[in-house]
Amino acid sequence: MNNQKYIRNFSIIAHIDHGKSTLADRLIEYCGGLNAREMSQQVLDSMDIERERGITIKAQTVRLVYKAKNGNTYYLNLMDTPGHVDFAYEVSRSLAACEGSLLVVDSTQGVEAQTLANVYQAIANDHLIVPVLNKIDLAASEPDYVKTQIEDIIGIDASEAVLISAKNGIGIDSVLEAIINKLPAPKESSTDILKALLVDSWYDPYLGVVILVRIIDGALRKNMRVKMMRTNSVYTVEHVGFFTPKKHISDVLYAGEIGFFTASIKRVSDCKVGDTITDEKKSCEQALPGFKPNIPVVFCGFYPTDSAEFEHLKDSLAKLRLNDASFEYEMESSSALGVGFRCGFLGLLHLEIIQERLSREFDLDLITTAPSVIYKINMLDGQNLEIHNPADLPDLQKIASMEEPWIKATIIVPDEFIGTVLSLCTEKRGIQLDHSYISNRAKIVYKLPLNEIVYDFYDRLKSCSKGYASFEWQMDVYELSDLVNLRILVNGEVVDALSTIVHRSRAEQRGRALCIRLKDLIPRQQIDIAIQASVGSRIIARETIKALRKDVLSKCYGGDISRKRKLLEKQKAGKKKMRQYGNIEIPQSAFIAALQIGGE
């Protein structure tokens, strides 16, 4: 397709569960991308985990062919994007490849916190936005009220918002006409020299790395020699194509189009998301700006339960990193858990999804350490450090001050649940910044410490609002804080995998909870086991697992008391030796359960 005025590149943005993927299904069905037999629910959500959870994790692309009412045939490139704040990097990449967006809002729920986050990204990318109100067939639908909400909160005109029911296929033709008439075509190509944006990549066991590109200038052809501008790697293009959503092979991709190519690329490191791809012989002079990298904010350790699985874990992480550029990892070792990896994520859901993908797609059984965030340490000698692993925390005597990250959180909640939500935020050391009302719902803006959020905040927010609250956050500032390194000792030995950095006011509560949990999990042995929580040299909590008593007198049937005394003295000496030299074996099941203590 070489005439760009008949191309439209657009994304669908929305809050979770407002009907993005269902609308994508209906658009594919209406344009004949798949026949009725091939259609399934959430057809663009290709991972099992996406369908089970009802969320989109990976942005997907599909080319649709639509004959408009004006008689012309148009080629529509749809980018279906995630809604959850943890996958904002996927959203940003999709938006950079498009000129416009459909803003889908549930007409029974209205504007939610993550709707705001995603629509502001679209506005920052200079997108034209078409509001679409979904679920108008439901009795609770309030389209006029939601239109007013969109105009008041987001500030875009919603008077001509398209009314649809994606589930029942109502209004789908109106959406397609709005895409044609309201969204712009790609800019005309300014040169014949190839310039393409690397939007995404994934690993295929037969083809090597598959690269998704948006062609900005020129054309990408089969057998062409192309260069990655960031790494200067050169490859010969073997296959070129696009998704309908089935894979469709073609010979060329022209300016304005979105498609994929393969080139027997085996080195994962050559494919940097946001890189510029150009012709080896006639290279473009200036690379595209690419994407602003998302910085991981939540960290934890992944350790294989079987040390023989380490290399398999290493290869699996490399393949996942190719498919998810916002995920980072580095090797680390623990005296308790062996060798593993310290991994960085955009949030807790991101962590959970990566963990589940490693389990499902690569059949790995992992131990995951407690999540932590990046702390800034100001040393007495003038050095400034950034750490996210409690084991790396220097001696407290050498530290001048410590800073922790704070976030700015926006919570939208029905007014009947305001009291419980405010109590939760206060409990988490939050500072209220704003409190306003949108009809019968409140918009609350809080400043919260990130390390209070990474454990159980989202679950408790949903629980105390009966699932009605929506939550979106962004990094704000680092502030001085009274932080301590909470260490767990078993019989005087520090268990590094259970160490965590907490605010001093929370240390005793968290330490006591961990000690009680470990007491229930570690099996009794022939000596007393002391489980202690300490801050520096001070013990703040202790639990004791009482010894099992082996009856050494069971084989004595009466007789001289000196024989019994001799056996008891021998047992006593043995226990003394065990206390002196014995190591307590903590089962891995105890580690796994204890590391779930986070929010208690």
From Swiss-Prot:
Pfam families: EFG_C, GTP_EFTU, GTP_EFTU_D2, LepA_C. It catalyses: GTP + H2O = GDP + phosphate + H(+). It is found in: Cell inner membrane. One of its GO terms (cellular component) is plasma membrane. Residues 5-187 form the tr-type G domain. Its EC number is 3.6.5.n1. It comes from the Bacteria. GTP binds at residues 17-22, 134-137. Transmembrane segments: none annotated. One of its GO terms (biological process) is positive regulation of translation. InterPro entries: EF-4 (IPR006297), EFG_III/V (IPR035647), EFG_V-like (IPR000640), EFTu-like_2 (IPR004161), G_TR_CS (IPR031157), LepA_C_sf (IPR038363), LepA_CTD (IPR013842), LepA_IV (IPR035654). Keywords: Cell inner membrane, Cell membrane, GTP-binding, Hydrolase, Membrane, Nucleotide-binding, Protein biosynthesis. It is an enzyme of class 3 (hydrolase). It is a peripheral membrane protein. One of its GO terms (molecular function) is ribosome binding. PANTHER family: TRANSLATION FACTOR GUF1 HOMOLOG, CHLOROPLASTIC, TRANSLATION FACTOR GUF1-RELATED. Belongs to the TRAFAC class translation factor GTPase superfamily. Classic translation factor GTPase family. LepA subfamily. Required for accurate and efficient protein synthesis under certain stress conditions. May act as a fidelity factor of the translation reaction, by catalyzing a one-codon backward translocation of tRNAs on improperly translocated ribosomes. Back-translocation proceeds from a post-translocation (POST) complex to a pre-translocation (PRE) complex, thus giving elongation factor G a second chance to translocate the tRNAs correctly. Binds to ribosomes in a GTP-dependent manner. This is Elongation factor 4. It comes from Rickettsia prowazekii (strain Madrid E).
